[in-house]
């Protein structure tokens, strides 16, 4: 539980912790690569630590010293049948991408997670993997955990994904690494492309044409060095705080600027935020840079279409941003929010209403009315890290103290979030 009341502006410089998506992939790809992989600025959140724990159970030696991680790759054929179940905790990325990897290995695994994972849909991954010859079972015919999988003898497929999901795309591509022939995934909209970028960094040939990605089976990954940029989804909370808390100016260092993830920057700029991006670097792998944001006069906008996959995780904090804009903001085409750690359409609306916000849920998003004053109150993260952090930023503009129940959920992706907020 956290009790927050803020009566002054937010000013200072913050180094954003490592990107969660990239940290997951660095460990997974390093585990199935040949040779050693060294990862710096690894995110020490609970989700990424679950990935390390699972691959250790698969026989991979992984050393960790602070934010530096060394993975001694086994190659895909070197993974070992685990003696116990693989527990992914709260991590949807871990379970879905790991299913793709395990589709290649001829042994049995059982995968479980926490209560939240037990409610999240898995057939979007298990169905295409079954088409590729993986043997998968689970509750409701593989829709929910626990799941069991036995892989081997994978064949490439051309899969037209009904959803723009990097997790679905990645699972299929990873299954195709040792598959027979070519594996191709086409999405309705482009999702984040960290898997494609990292496969190339590990020496794999990946072809990308528009929203279609393909690779030929039989390729091996070669260990490498990965420097993880800061997570723009974590930075988003401080970007919004800087824009809406009076008398604020925040500099965020080393923020990932992958074009498939920068929807939050586009939204802030369209709403009129005073924002600058400097010192862009590392563009050949994962671009990153420094972002400065300050208190701004904002205008409500409509958010939807191809922008949604580029900011799906930032929608809770964008909803808060919209409460301080002039006019109405409409978020649409965001049905995917319903199958996140919580139904984020419902939880965002429910919790912001407790702070006096006028906001409406729709079937695929929400309508947020602007120029609102927030009041203090008791709110709940629902065990969802992004809801918890959004509510913490909301407390900075509330008239009165805000008590956040289950605030420890933020440790999933941002263990030192409250410390950094207090430092400003």
UniProtKB/Swiss-Prot annotation:
Species of the source: Bacillus cytotoxicus (strain DSM 22905 / CIP 110041 / 391-98 / NVH 391-98)
The reply on keyword Cytoplasm is: yes
Concerning NCBIfam families, the annotation shows: aroA
Q: Name one GO molecular function term.
A: 3-phosphoshikimate 1-carboxyvinyltransferase activity
Give any single GO term for biological process: amino acid biosynthetic process
Q: What is the lineage of its organism?
A: Bacteria, Bacillati, Bacillota, Bacilli, Bacillales
What this protein is called in its record is 3-phosphoshikimate 1-carboxyvinyltransferase
Cross-referenced HAMAP family: EPSP_synth
- InterPro entries, sorted: Enolpyruvate_Tfrase_dom (IPR001986), Enolpyruvate_Tfrase_sf (IPR036968), EPSP_synthase (IPR006264), EPSP_synthase_CS (IPR023193), RNA3'P_cycl/enolpyr_Trfase_a/b (IPR013792)
